């Protein structure tokens, strides 16, 4: 089930981040880049800011979606190692999140000098690695059991 959810979750993340952009939520750091935007009525002030929500929609959403779809359809990893694709999703999403957080207005509270999103993403990377390891162990045990028959 986790592998199937992993194939769809990035699309939801993409649309959610686009909604954040439209609503002027979770804005980026102040910036002078030519594509910076000003969010009116958002509490972000009148400074031009990185459209970090769109960066996240692209990286956490579209790029992760394409990667997961490729792994699901071309490599058939979900069929060969059930659970691994979910682990790969957690890792890919977390890496994308850590990168995108560089452009986002930081949280009021930092943990060990990094944003809460980056900190929690480190935990998701560990969780993803554990899922992959468990999927591989399960596949090896299942294969060993079948070869004895």
Segments and roles (model prediction):
Residues 1-149:
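A feature for loop-to-transmembrane-helix boundaries and adjacent hydrophobic helices
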